[in-house]
Every structure is written in C-alpha cells, then in structure tokens.
UniProtKB/Swiss-Prot annotation:
Trimers of one alpha 2(I) and two alpha 1(I) chains. The lineage of its organism: Eukaryota, Metazoa, Chordata, Craniata, Vertebrata. Prolines at the third position of the tripeptide repeating unit (G-X-Y) are hydroxylated in some or all of the chains. The modification 4-hydroxyproline is found at residues 20, 23, 26, 35, 38, 41, 56, 71, 77, 86, 92, 119, 122, 128, 137, 143, 164, 173, 176, 203, 206, 218, 224, 233, 239, 242, 257, 266, 269, 281, 290, 305, 311, 320, 326, 344, 353, 359, 365, 374, 377, 386, 395, 401, 413, 422, 431, 434, 452, 470, 476, 482, 488, 494, 500, 512, 521, 533, 545, 548, 554, 560, 569, 587, 602, 608, 629, 635, 638, 647, 653, 671, 680, 689, 701, 707, 716, 725, 728, 749, 758, 767, 776, 794, 803, 806, 812, 827, 833, 839, 848, 854, 875, 878, 881, 953, 956, 974, 989, 995, 1010, 1013, 1016, 1019, 1022. The gene is COL1A1. The modification 5-hydroxylysine is found at K95, K260, K335, K581, K692, K863, K926, K938. This is Collagen alpha-1(I) chain. It comes from Mylodon darwinii (Giant ground sloth). Type I collagen is a member of group I collagen (fibrillar forming collagen). These protein fragments were extracted from ancient bone material. The displayed protein fragments were extracted from an ancient caudal vertebra bone collected in Ultima Esperanza, Chile and around 13045 years old. The tryptic peptides required multiple purification steps in order to eliminate contaminants and to increase the concentration of peptidic material. Residues 59-73, 923-937 have a biased composition (Basic and acidic residues).
Length: 1022
C-alpha cells in the first residue's frame, strides 16, 4: 500500500558487459624531475696521436626508471552497496573541446655536466695522404777541393789525400839530375765533401845534383786525385704542392658507449588530448530483472590515493542477462550524490512496444503541480504497453530554441569555484516518487568539457536494454547553452517506491589532476523547448576511456532537467482528448526512460482523467535507462495531493543522466479548462543533486620543471553550489626554475655525460586552503627538458577527482539560484563504455600558469626519441683530452599536457632549491574522485646532451718525418657544449596499464551550466 515498506526482491542478473572501447589517446606526460647530480669526471688518459675524427659517439643509455612512489594508504572502504539495477547503455560522450596547449616552458638551464663517459675507442688512422710531388732537385754541390798536386820531382811524395778522397799515388821517381818539371795538376776531382783541403804534400828533397845531363823526360802525369766525397746535401727543395686530398680514412669504430646516463627529467606533461569521438551506442540488451535494493552505504572516510594499477584489458561484452523477476518494492535509500551528467547520445529508432508492466504500488503523492491551462475534455486514454527501448540515435542538428527548463535539484555543495555568471533560476519541478537507491558511482576524474554538440532529433522511446558491464566512464560533455524555460509538465503518477540501492564501496581518492587550460566559452546554442521529465534510466556501463579532451569552454549554466518517475514507456500514441478527471490510478512501475521521440504536432490538452483506485503494490521494476527527454506535454491540471508517504531515506545521488537532445519547441496547445486545485501535497524528498556543472577551465599549465612564472588566471567558471571544502593538500616539493648556466669554455667535444637520475616523483598534493602568495623562489637549475611525449592512453574515467593544483585565487563565484527540488529518481547503473574518439589537435599554447605550490614529484614521463645529431663541426686541433664539456642546452619543453596519474616515485634525485610557495590559486571545483586512471605511459626522459658533432676531416697535411712521440700534453679545457639536437619524434604510446584502484567518491561539484533542453517527451499514459 502507499507508504508501506516493501520487501526487496531477489537481485536480477547483471546486464551484458559493454564492448571494449578503442584505446584512448595517450595520457599526459609526467612532470619534469629535478636534474641529476653531476657525475665525477673520469680520469683523462694519455694523449695519443690524433687520428681522423671518428663518428660521434652514441648517447649513453637512458638511466633506469625511477622507483615507484609509495602508494598512498588505502582509505577504509565504505560499506558495499547492493548492485544497482542494470540500465541501458549510456550514450557516448560528445567530443570534448580541444584544450589549448600550454606555452613552451622556458628553456631550462643546462644541467651540470655528468661524469665523463669512458673514452671512445680511437678511430682508425686515416689513410695516408698522397705523397706530394717530388721536390725540386737540390742545387749542385760546390766542386770539391782540388786534389793534392803531384809531388814535384821524381821523388815528390804524394800529397796527403783529403779526408774523404784517397791519396793519389806518388809519381814515379824522377831521374836524378835535373829537377823534374812540375807535374801537371791532376784532373779536378769530383766535388769533395766539403772536407778540409788536403795538406799539400811536402816537396821531396832535392835530388843530388846530377851531372848536368840532358833534361830528363817530363815526369808522368800524376794520377788524378781520388773522387772527393759527396758534397753536402743540397738545400731542400721548396715544399711540393700539397698532394691531392687522400681518401678519408675508414670510419673509426664507434666510441665505447659512455656510462649509462642518468634518467633525464620527465618531460613536461603533454597537452590534454582531445575527447574521443562519440562512440556508437552498443546494442540494446535484454532488460535484466531488478535486483533487490540494498541499503545505502555510508560514505567511507576518504582514503589516501592508492598506487596506480596497470590497466587491464577491456573485458568482452557479456551476453544479455535473462530477465529476472521483478523485485519487491524497497524502501527508498538515502539520497546519494548526483552523478555526472552524461553527454547526449544519438536518438535511436522507435522500438517495438514492450510488455505491459504490472501495476505498481501507489507512489508517494507528488507535490502540487502547476496549474495548467484547461484542456478540452476527452475520453480516457488507455495506457499502452511499454515499447522496447530503441537504439541510441545520433545527435541531430540543434533544435529551435525551446522553452526554459525547470530548475534541477540542488547538488551537494562543491568547492568554492571561480566567480561565474549567476545562473538562471529554474522552475520548480514536479517531485516524483523516490527511486531506488543505486550503487555508489565510481570516482572519476573530471574530464575536459567538450564543446556542446548539436541537439539530435528526438528519438522514440525504446525499451530498456540490458545493463552493460561497467565500462570506462566517458568525459563529461560540455554544458549546453541555456534552454528556454519549459512549460510546466503534467503531474505524473507517483511511481513505486523503489527499493533502496546498495551502498557502494567507497573508492579511493584519486590523484588530483592539474587544472586545465581555460577554454573559450562555447557558443550558446538555440534555446530548446523544455522537455517533459523523462524517466530515469539505469546508468549504462562506463564507456571505454576516451582520450582526455582538452578543457572545453565553460558553457552557460543550464537548467537541470526534471527527473521523471521511471515508468515503462508505452508506445507513443496519439494524444486523445482529455477526459474528465478520474480517480488517481495506481502508480505504474518505473518505466525505462526512452529516447526522445520525434516531435509531433501538439495535441489538444487532455482533461484530467478520473482518479483510479490504488492498485495492488507491484514489484519494483528495474531502474530504467535514462532516456532522452520526451516532448513536453501541455500542462495538465494539478492532481490531488496523495497521502504523505513515509519519508524515504536519503538515496545515493543518482547517476548523472545524459543531457537530452534539444527538442524543437512545440506549438502551444489550446488552453484546457482549469482543473481543481488540489490540496498541497507533502513535501517531496530532496531530489538528487543536479548534474555537476562543467568544470571551470583551469589556467594554462605552467612550464615544466620547477614552477615558472605566474600564469594567467583563467576566466571564472560558472558558480557552483558551495561544496564542502576539501582538505588542504600538502605542499609539494617543486622548486623554482633556476637560471640557465653559462656555457663552458670550448674544448673538443666531450663525451655525452649521462644525465643524473631523475628525482623521486612527489605525490600530488591535494589543493590546500588558499594561501598567501609567496615570494619568488630561488631559481634552481633547469633540468634537461624532454621532448614532448605522446599523450598517454587515458585511464578509466573515474568520478571527479580532486581539484588540481590550486591556481591563482579568483574572486568568489556568485551563488547561483538554487533550483527547486526535483523528483528524486533512482540512480541508474553505470552506462556502457563510450568509444574513445580520436585525439584532437593540440590547442594553442597557453601562457605559463602561476607558480603552484610544489606538488609531489610526478612519475617519469615517457621516454622520447633521441634527438638527431647536430651537424659535424670543423675538426679541432689535436689537443690533450679535454675535461668533459658541459651538457648541451636542454631541448625545448614540450607542451604541458594534463597531469597523468601519479606514477611510482623515482629514486630521489638531488633536491633543487625550493622555491617559495606560489600564490594559492582558487579552489578548483571539487570533482568526484574518479577511479585511479591508467598509469600514464612513461614520460620522456629528456635527451641526453648530444655529443658535440665531429668536425669534417681536415685536409691531410704533408707527410713529414715521424718524430718521436712527445709526452702527453696537459689536459685541455672542457669542450664547448654541443648544439642541442632537434626534438625527437614522439614515442609511440605505451600499452594501457591495468586499471588502477577505485578512487573515492568526491563531493558533488557546483551545479553546471544548463544543458540544452531536450525535446518534449511523449505524452504519458492518461
């Protein structure tokens, strides 16, 4: 009976598992770690003869990845809630707006030189140069000294020979008697060796005077003097012309690889990837039986973030579960936090009508409805059997401006958001019966808000599909433009009191994401007519993780739509003439929320039917999938107030339904007769919190590494409802960026020093309370900036994570008007995973963000490709081995992307000078803590300093005589830093890691901007 507590029925089988989505875009890179300490220089070896320059040595191997950080303590899990009813597959999220790429971080200073690598093997000697042309002949030697004269007289003794030449034989003795004639001088000897002139022979003693006889015959000619020694070598000819350039010697063997370089600092986080394209809706499964509603679990204490798990492979979609028996109506569970609003899915074709549901218990009386215009009396229409859920249709073009929608329920207070424009006050919705409490939603990280998609055509209401397996939660779609105020809908029949859903286990607290770049405001879409409140469908399985989209522009605050009672939708029939108001009929079971059907011509307003008698309590039906908003019917007369039911416990927040497609504004129906004013109904249960507002765009990320200059404050996002303040986050370790070091003196290209090991990745601190702006910190040395890494694969979409690092404090946002309490619908199960869309283009670079408080060191980013070697420089003169040159300048920092999930902390590196705490930024929107995303792929380690390029071989010199090897020369000055290589190519994304631990449920964020009103839903049963 109305107000009674029903016994929960058996739990139905879960629906089929959703198909795995395509892999998401790569996740963001990690933060840049501090520079490693410089290694000690190796001892220099003796200087050998310089060979031709060998090829440049290879860069040292990258250092090992840092050790994983300590996993956070796991918070105590909350009580496990019962499994929610399976719902139809959720519609895939729309493509998120591509965020702006952060500005390139300032070029880091060169890190200290690492230890000198082992000297490379000396290159082979080059082939000797060709011999130069023969030198000119030397000058002819001067003639040698004349040989000694022959001895005078017969007995003249031969003159002493010059030192080189032998002494000529003595002339024959003369006949005694007259003095012989002087012998002729011997022929000129060959040129002597510049030896001393031979001593002139002493004249022989005169012979005894003979009798004067006849003159003797002249003495024989003396023998020619011996050939003088060779003259001194002629003067060296002028140097020959240089010989033709000899062929280059064979390339010397590559130098031995230097010592393993320290890991480079992690690259700057990559830009947030674009939201993946909207996936096709999965097939509609068979509706599973409703499970028993469990009691709502209390929220467990927030646990520390657990270690990031490796992502598991997506499971296969299970077959549809058999339809279970409907469970008995349960007591409404306590109100849970509102889930995120999903993106509108495409409208599916009209499904065939389903079986008529059993009559449900009389629901709690609804609040007094708005008085509608009197309708012309008509015959009582019969309730048609519910039709099967149609497949999700594709979003159609934006509809015409619709009427202003009713205000949604007020969400839990979120953190203080940036000042935004005040939202429009929503109209009070018709309270519905409390729905069954669904399981607690998973914590997901706040996804980037995508641009509003065009409103699709209204689909027909389809049957409820089987609940898919929990998939990855897609990114939240962008807030749509504010819709026009909708006409008050007819008061629905109170639905059955749903059984309380089980309380979900408390997820762990996810790592806080960085505040994304503030996107430009999205264009205001046409104002669609306010749709009639649709039935809350079960939340589909989470879709496969889409690539993290860039932060979309904050949309205008939309009016939350009503949450209609879930009833099995019947086929859309022609609207009959309103009959006389009958007795209130028994409330039907919550139907599946069908997709929005095509907008039909407005029918005449029906007269209120006779109130039917309360039927027997039917079993609680399964939570229907949330369909697109149906056409908004003409306002009906207010129904009589029902009996006050027992106050239901606060239910868990319902899953955020997908925003309905904007429906075309229907024609105004003829005014119906004014119905009697019913007595005021009891105060309805507090509705589930409205959909979370779009997350305000964060300011652009600062430069990688130590905190850079203060960035622009992003435009304030829409003001959300004030939420409970989050716990202050710990101060991180990030220091200020140091100035660039001076370039060392030029030397021969030094070996590539291995970079120091990366510092441990600090834990990401939760946003702390707004603190005063600190003085600028002492700049620390800039580490080598890695190439922009590929965006890592996105992790599972968890619930909204903690706010990112606080940005600059913004003005307090204006409190938007609180919406009236809407109907409290049961939260649906998680929808099926949406297909990940292709990553969007990188956004333009944002200005550097303000220095945030240092966060915990992030995990190393993915290793980037090695940079190309620089051009070869001219050969240097062979000098003594120089000291290791300083590490080349770091490459430009890549665009800073979203912060990936914190990976394991690497080994602690030398802590840089800690900069003062930056100005405390405004508290980010407190998102629901998402499940721990997949661990981002390893960030780029940064390039090792490139070895200075080898110069081209010089022209071979003239071959001179080999001199004795001289002693090793003194050690030369350190070589100049090599020119930085080009940024390497982005590495391929790494494999998706297993899914991380479940994150905690975060507090509800502020009410987001109103989404585009959906098209009017089909008229309800009379």
């Amino acid at each position: 009976s109305a107000g009674g507590i029903s016994v929960p029925g058996p739990m139905g089988p879960s629906g089929p598992r959703g198909l795995p989505g395509p892999p998401g875009a790569p996740g963001p890179q990690g933060f840049q770690g501090p520079p490693g300490e410089p290694g000690e220089p190796g001892a220099s070896g003796p200087m050998g003869p310089r060979g031709p320059p060998g090829p440049p040595g290879k860069n040292g191997d990258d250092g090992e990845a840092g050790k994983p950080g300590r996993p956070g303590e796991r918070g105590p899990p909350g009580p496990q809630g019962a499994r929610g009813l399976p719902g139809t597959a959720g519609l895939p999220g729309m493509k998120g707006h591509r965020g702006f790429s952060g500005l390139d971080g300032a070029k880091g200073d060169a890190g200290p030189a690492g230890p000198k690598g082992e000297p490379g093997s000396p290159g082979e000697n080059g082939a000797p140069g060709q011999m130069g042309p023969r030198g000119l002949p030397g000058e002819r030697g001067r003639p040698g000294a004349s040989g000694p004269a022959g001895a005078r007289g017969n007995d003249g003794a031969a003159g002493a020979a010059g030192p080189p030449g032998p002494t000529g034989p003595a002339g024959p003795p003369g006949f005694p008697g007259a003095v012989g004639a002087k012998g002729e001088a011997g022929p000129q000897g060959a040129r002597g060796s510049e030896g001393p002139q031979g001593v002139r022979g002493e004249p022989g003693p005169p012979g005894p005077a003979g009798a004067a006889g006849p003159a003797g015959n002249p003495g024989a000619d003396g023998q020619p003097g011996a050939k003088g020694a060779n003259g001194a070598p002629g003067i060296a000819g002028a140097p020959g012309f240089p010989g033709a350039r000899g062929p280059s010697g064979p390339q010397g063997p590559s130098g031995a690889p230097g010592p393993k370089g320290n890991s480079g600092e992690p690259g700057a986080p990559g830009s947030k990837g674009d939201t993946g394209a909207k996936g096709e809706p999965g097939p509609t499964g068979i509706q599973g039986p409703p499970g028993p509603a469990g009691e709502e679990g209390k929220r467990g204490a927030r646990g520390e973030p657990g270690p990031t798990g490796l992502p598991g492979p997506p499971g296969e979609r299970g077959g549809p579960g058999s339809r279970g028996f409907p469970g008995a109506d349960g007591v409404a569970g306590p109100k849970g936090p509102a889930g995120e609003r999903g993106s509108p899915g495409p409208a599916g074709p009209k499904g065939s009508p389903g079986e008529a549901g059993r009559p449900g218990e009389a629901g709690l009386p609804g609040a007094k409805g708005l008085t509608g215009s009197p309708g012309s009396p008509g015959p009582d229409g019969k309730t048609g059997p519910p039709g099967p859920a149609g497949q999700d249709g594709r979003p159609g073009p934006p509809g015409p401006p619709g009427a202003r929608g009713q205000a949604g329920v007020m969400g839990f207070p979120g953190p203080k958001g940036a000042a935004g424009e005040p939202g429009k006050a929503g109209e009070r919705g018709v309270p519905g019966p409390p729905g069954a409490v669904g399981p607690a939603g998973k914590d997901g990280e706040a996804g980037a808000q995508g641009p509003p998609g065009p409103a699709g055509p209204a689909g027909e209401r389809g049957e409820q599909g089987p609940a898919g397996s929990p998939g990855f939660q897609g990114l939240p779609g962008p807030a749509g433009p504010p819709g026009e105020a909708g006409k008050p809908g007819e008061q629905g029949v109170p639905g059955d009191l749903g059984a309380p859903g089980p309380s979900g286990a408390r997820g762990e607290r996810g790592f806080p994401g960085e505040r994304g770049v503030q996107g430009p405001p999205g264009p205001a879409g046409p104002r669609g007519s306010n749709g009639a409140p649709g039935n809350d469908g079960a939340k589909g399985d989470a879709g496969a993780p889409g690539a993290p989209g860039s932060q979309g522009a904050p949309g205008l605050q939309g009016m939350p739509g009503e949450r209609g009672a879930a009833g099995l939708p019947g086929p859309k029939g022609d609207r009959g003439d309103a009959g006389p108001k009958g007795a209130d009929g028994a409330p039907g079971k919550d139907g599946v929320r069908g997709l929005t059907g095509p907008i039909g011509p407005p029918g005449p307003a029906g007269a209120p039917g006779d109130k039917g008698e309360s039927g027997p309590s039917g079993p609680a039906g399964p939570t229907g999938a949330r369909g697109a908003p149906g056409d908004r019917g003409e306002p009906g007369p207010p129904g009589p107030a029902g009996f006050a039911g027992p106050p239901g416990a606060d239910g868990q927040p319902g899953a955020k339904g997908e925003p309905g497609d904007a429906g075309a504004k229907g024609d105004a129906g003829p005014p119906g007769p004014a119905g009697p004013t019913g007595p005021p109904g009891p105060i309805g249960n507090v509705g589930a919190p409205g959909p979370k507002g779009a997350r305000g765009s964060a300011g652009p990320p600062g430069a990688t590494g130590f905190p850079g200059a203060a960035g622009r404050v992003g435009p304030p996002g829409p003001s959300g409802n004030a939420g409970p303040p989050g716990p202050p986050g710990p101060v991180g370790k990030e220091g200020g960026k140091g100035p660039r070091g001076e370039t060392g003196p030029a030397g021969r290209p030094g070996e590539v020093s291995p970079p120091g090991p990366p510092g441990p990745t600090g834990e990401k601190g939760s946003p702390g309370a707004d603190g005063p702006a600190g003085a600028p910190g002492t700049p620390g040395p800039q580490g080598i900036s890695g190439q922009r890494g590929v965006v890592g694969l996105p992790g599972q979409r968890g619930e909204r994570g903690f706010p990112g690092l606080p940005g600059p404090s913004g003005e307090p946002g204006k409190q938007g008007p609180s919406g009236s309490s809407g109907e409290r619908g049961p939260p649906g199960p998680v929808g099926p995973p949406g297909l990940a869309g292709p990553p969007g283009e990188s956004g333009r670079e944002g200005s550097p963000g303000a220095e945030g408080s240092p966060g915990r060191d992030g995990s190393p980013g993915p290793k980037g490709d090695r940079g190309e070697s620089g051009p070869a420089g001219p050969p240097g003169a062979p000098g003594a081995p120089g000291a290791p040159g300083p590490v080349g300048p770091a490459g430009k920092s890549g665009d800073r992307g979203e912060t990936g999930p914190a990976g394991p902390a690497g080994p602690a590196g030398p802590a840089g000078a800690r900069g003062p705490a930056g100005p405390q930024g405004p508290r980010g929107d407190k998102g629901e803590t998402g499940e721990q995303g997949d661990r981002g792929i390893k960030g780029h380690r940064g390039f090792s300093g490139l070895q200075g390029p080898a110069g081209p071989p010089g022209s071979p010199g003239e071959q001179g005589p080999s001199g004795a090897s001289g002693p090793a020369g003194p050690r030369g000055p350190p070589g100049s830093a090599g020119s930085p290589g080009k940024d390497g190519l982005n590495g391929l994304p790494g494999p998706i890691g297993p899914p991380g631990p479940r994150g905690r449920t975060g507090d509800a964020g502020p009410v987001g901007p109103p989404g585009p009103p959906g098209p009017p839903g089909p008229p309800g049963p009379p």
